[in-house]
């Protein structure tokens, strides 16, 4: 059998060509299809892995962005409440001194302010009415420049008006000639007279009006010893005391 293949010329020719193909590469083995793989692509794919991990990590980082927004919102809300508290504190400071003994709640502050505003409006209306009456009296009964000499010659007391703002507060208005205000009844003396009647001084203001007149506006608070006295009667007594004091 072996002799048959050896003697067969076709078989010998095919074997010779196969051996030639095998050994024609000077000892090199035939190339394998696996050797055509591009290793650079594999390395590039591996280098992309951290980027993918970072992308995943950034996905989890969106939760951090939400936390940042929450912190910003909390800081904004804290500042807003602080500003509101400062505004309410300023509003409480405008209330009478009796309301400053303790820190009022926000609803109580608003309630007190809503009650206090009409009282102030009433006070302004009374002052405007008094001023109008004084101006009308000055222009009707006397000529400019004559009223001062008439008051000084006759020894007339200044015009005094006391008004109850509420159960605890009183506003006293005094009108007198400007050229005698400093000697007859200066503001400091007028305040001292009122304090001697059991009142606590809160604030005051002065202004000059028509007819060479000076106006005092004095805001006072009643003490505990004067609360039992009816406000209209108490105001009337204050007016008399101030007028009598101005005659000294």
Curated annotation (Swiss-Prot):
Region Helix-loop-helix motif, residue ranges: 82-120
GO terms assigned for molecular function: DNA-binding transcription factor activity; DNA-binding transcription factor activity, RNA polymerase II-specific; protein dimerization activity; RNA polymerase II transcription regulatory region sequence-specific DNA binding
CC terms in the record's Gene Ontology section: RNA polymerase II transcription regulator complex
Signal peptide positions on this chain: none
InterPro entries listed in its UniProt record: bHLH_dom, HLH_DNA-bd_sf, MASH1/Ascl1a-like
Family matches, as Pfam families: HLH
GO BP annotations listed: ethylene-activated signaling pathway; positive regulation of DNA-templated transcription; positive regulation of siderophore biosynthetic process; regulation of DNA-templated transcription; regulation of ethylene-activated signaling pathway; response to arsenic-containing substance; response to cadmium ion; response to iron ion starvation
Keywords, in A-Z order: Activator, DNA-binding, Ethylene signaling pathway, Iron, Nucleus, Stress response, Transcription, Transcription regulation
Principal subcellular localisation of the protein: nucleus
PROSITE patterns recorded: BHLH (PS50888)
Superkingdom field: Eukaryota
Region (Basic motif): 68-81
Protein's job: Transcription activator that binds to the DNA motif 5'-CACGTGG-3' in the promoter of iron (Fe) deficiency-inducible genes as well as of genes involved in iron homeostasis, thus contributing to basal tolerance to iron deficiency, iron uptake from soil and iron transport, particularly during seed maturation and germination. Promotes the accumulation of mugineic acid family phytosiderophores (MAs). Required for ethylene-mediated signaling during iron deficiency responses. Improves growth and yield, especially in calcareous soil with low iron availability.
Protein name: Protein IRON-RELATED TRANSCRIPTION FACTOR 2
Gene name in the database record: IRO2
């Amino acid at each position: 059998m072996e002799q048959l293949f050896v003697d067969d010329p076709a078989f010998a020719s095919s074997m010779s060509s196969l051996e030639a193909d095998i050994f024609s590469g000077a000892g090199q083995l035939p190339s394998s299809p696996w050797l055509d793989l591009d290793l650079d692509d594999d390395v590039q794919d591996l280098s992309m892995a951290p980027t993918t991990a970072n992308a995943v990590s950034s996905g989890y980082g969106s939760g951090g962005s939400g936390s940042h927004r929450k912190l910003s919102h909390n800081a904004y809300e804290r500042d807003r409440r602080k500003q509101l508290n400062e505004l309410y504190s300023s509003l409480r400071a405008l209330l009478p001194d009796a309301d400053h003994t303790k820190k009022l709640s926000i609803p109580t502050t608003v309630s007190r302010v809503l009650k206090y505003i009409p009282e102030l409006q009433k006070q302004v209306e009374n002052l405007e009415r008094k001023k109008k009456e004084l101006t009308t009296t000055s222009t009707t009964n006397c000529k400019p420049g004559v009223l001062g000499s008439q008051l000084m010659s006759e020894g007339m007391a200044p015009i005094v008006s006391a008004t109850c703002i509420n159960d605890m507060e009183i506003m006293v208005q005094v009108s007198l000639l400007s050229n005698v205000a400093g000697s007859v009844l200066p503001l400091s003396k007028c305040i001292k007279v009122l304090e001697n009647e059991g009142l606590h001084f809160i604030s005051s203001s002065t202004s000059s009006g028509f007819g060479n007149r000076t106006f005092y506006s004095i805001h006072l608070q009643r003490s505990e010893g004067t609360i039992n006295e009816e406000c209209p009667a108490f105001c009337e007594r204050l007016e008399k005391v101030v007028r009598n004091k101005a005659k000294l």
